[in-house]
Amino acid sequence: MKINQFGTQSVNPYQKNYDKQAVQKTVAQPQDKIEISSQAKEMQHASDAVTGSRQEKIAQLKAQIENGSYKVDANHIAKNMINFYKKQ
């Protein structure tokens, strides 16, 4: 009667393949990259300029409201609303 050698290699013969695949997966993962075009950068600068002027306008309106000098022109608002809905 012949008894074959019994070891851990024959218990899990797929372990070698699994280990190789794990190494390949960790090596093969690419890094993410972000590239911003010059046109997008120009748009960002333009947006920043508009935001700055808008902040100034908001500060002026807040000051007028606190002083009580802010007046609402109902006719102007109504005309703008009518023009807005006519365009749609």
From Swiss-Prot:
Xref: Gene3D superfamilies: Anti-sigma-28 factor FlgM
Keyword DNA-binding attached: no
A biological process from GO: bacterial-type flagellum organization
Keywords of the record: Bacterial flagellum biogenesis, Repressor, Transcription, Transcription regulation
GO molecular function: sigma factor antagonist activity
Superkingdom in the source lineage: Bacteria
Chain's role: Allows the coupling of early and late flagellar synthesis through the repression of RNA polymerase sigma-D factor-dependent transcription.
Family label: Belongs to the FlgM family.
Name of this protein: Negative regulator of flagellin synthesis
Source organism (scientific name): Bacillus subtilis (strain 168)
Organism classification: Bacteria, Bacillati, Bacillota, Bacilli, Bacillales
Gene behind this protein: flgM
